[in-house]
Amino acid sequence: MKSNKIKYLGCFVGATKPDFMLGMVKTVVDYGATSFMFYSGPPQSFRRTPTAQFKLDLAKAYLAKHNLGDLGDNYVVHAPYLINLANGDSTKRERSFNFFLDELKRTNELGAKYFVLHPGSALNVKDKTQALDHLATELNRAISMTKDTIICLETMADKGQQICSKFEELRYVIDQISDKSRIGVCFDTCHVHDAGYDLAKTQELIDHFDQVIGLKYLYVIHLNDSKNPMGARKDRHANIGYGKIGFENLLNFIYHKEICNKIIILETPWIDDPIRGEVPLYKEEIEMIRNKKFVEGLVNEES
């Protein structure tokens, strides 16, 4: 299984001024990554910088110079956290929709094929089914007003009133989408583990996903370990191999023949380095994954 090759392996990078995407791809190259994910603006804010300032052409040229031209549009924009298309309050849902629609258009302008969306929470509704119906309705409306971008609904940890922690709920929404070429799934390993699915049973889990949802809808993997026991419903990411899922289980999953061709994105915690301050371990984690060898001592496991 681990003889399979992972093509798109990357991490979250920040879209910071003044270089925006050019700065992002420089970081990607430095990390040894072959894909990446970013927010097009602050995830907890409605403020946005025009996409014309993101230096997309320079970023594409930089990728080509470093032999990453085949990345093409296989990178990911993550939706801001303020969007909840499942809200039963029509005024709040409409505000979310307008922000969502703008983000979809920005994603297309920034050349990304995939847009990852947290499905939302069942607020101001009688039950989760009503929340799922609201989500499907708004997704269809947005898809009819945009083009190309594939919306990937993220598997959630079942924390609070979250929807789509169960594969069946994702399938319920997908079944209602008119243009199924525009809908997909982002599989978050921490969230799935925290929702009660067992990543130690790789083949069984993949088969179950395929039977309920269909592997053809799986486009993006968020690769995270978990600080919590399976089924905790808490959503606390851990660095790869330093959590309750474990290095070997995560490797067995991502090197599986049905998974290794997906876009795999690290979203793991940063560490507090006494010299460098707060820094990510993405470069080290990518090396561990490529080398298929766990490195101890990178994280203070008491933290």
Curated annotation (Swiss-Prot):
Q: One of this protein's Pfam families, by short name? A: AP_endonuc_2
Free-text remark on how the cofactor is bound: Binds 3 Zn(2+) ions.
State the CDD domains in the record: AP2Ec (cd00019)
Residue sites binding Zn(2+) 2 per the record = 154, 188, 222, 267
What Gene3D superfamilies does this protein map onto? Divalent-metal-dependent TIM barrel enzymes
Recorded GO terms, molecular function? deoxyribonuclease IV (phage-T4-induced) activity; DNA binding; DNA-(apurinic or apyrimidinic site) endonuclease activity; phosphoric diester hydrolase activity; zinc ion binding
Q: Name the cofactor(s).
A: Zn(2+)
Question: Would I find Nuclease among this entry's keywords?
Answer: yes
Give the enzyme class. hydrolase
Residues bound to Zn(2+) 1 are: 78, 118, 154
Q: Which domain of life is it from?
A: Bacteria
Q: Where does Zn(2+) 3 bind?
A: 191, 235, 237
Instruction: Name the chemical reaction catalysed here.
Output: Endonucleolytic cleavage to 5'-phosphooligonucleotide end-products
Keywords in alphabetical order, please: DNA damage, DNA repair, Endonuclease, Hydrolase, Metal-binding, Nuclease, Zinc
Q: What Enzyme Commission number does this protein have?
A: 3.1.21.2
Looking up SUPFAM superfamilies in the UniProt record yields: Xylose isomerase-like
GO biological process terms, alphabetically, are:
base-excision repair
What SMART domains does UniProt report for this protein, alphabetically?
AP2Ec
Q: Which InterPro entries match?
A: AP_endonuc_2, AP_endonuc_F2_Zn_BS, Xyl_isomerase-like_sf, Xyl_isomerase-like_TIM-brl
What the record says about family reads: Belongs to the AP endonuclease 2 family.
HAMAP family the UniProt entry points to: Nfo
User: Which NCBIfam families does this entry report, sorted A to Z?
Assistant: nfo (TIGR00587)
What does the UniProt function comment say about this protein? Endonuclease IV plays a role in DNA repair. It cleaves phosphodiester bonds at apurinic or apyrimidinic (AP) sites, generating a 3'-hydroxyl group and a 5'-terminal sugar phosphate.
Question: What name does UniProt use for this protein?
Answer: Probable endonuclease 4
Q: What is the source species?
A: Mycoplasmoides gallisepticum (strain R(low / passage 15 / clone 2))
